[in-house]
């Protein structure tokens, strides 16, 4: 049977490495960023840990807001394409983005058979913002077509 959020304690979850929720008011004009009490996760790992630990306590977010760029070193022009131009060597980025967090969250909802709650994307990275939105939209479309129950 599908889990329902109405039977759980809820919270609002904000994923961003730098900003506070209230700062999003200046460009999104959504009053929820200024009026809600948010749980803030600064990294993908912190996001995952928050979801899992609060789920174990019978809590699930009723609202999630995603940033995309969680590690600014990925966007340093000297380090594009996985090459550290400062030291002339290949590098591997270890920090995950908000897209990884959105994918985790969608998979978590599938695994526990719960509907995806309302999700916002406050990222200022247009390509990253669109990829997160598309991931969430694809899952919502899947839910509408097939339901969220596991087979």
At which residue positions do the language-model features occur?
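Catalytic phosphate/metal-binding cores of nucleic-acid and nucleotide-processing enzymes, i.e., regions
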Residues: 1-151
């Amino acid at each position: 049977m599908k889990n329902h959020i109405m039977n759980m304690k809820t919270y609002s979850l904000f994923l961003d490495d730098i900003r506070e929720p209230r700062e999003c008011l200046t460009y999104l004009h959504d009053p929820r960023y200024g009026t809600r009490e948010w749980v803030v996760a600064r990294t993908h790992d912190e996001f995952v840990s928050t979801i899992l630990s609060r789920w174990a306590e019978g809590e699930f977010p009723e609202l999630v807001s995603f940033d995309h760029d969680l590690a600014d070193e990925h966007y340093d022009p000297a380090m594009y394409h996985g090459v550290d131009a400062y030291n002339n060597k290949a590098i591997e980025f270890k920090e995950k983005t908000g897209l990884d967090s959105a994918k985790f969250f969608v998979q978590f909802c599938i695994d526990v058979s719960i509907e995806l709650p309302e999700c916002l994307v406050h990222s200022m990275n247009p390509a990253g913002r669109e990829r997160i939105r598309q991931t969430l939209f694809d899952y919502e479309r899947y839910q509408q077509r097939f339901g969220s129950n596991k087979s």
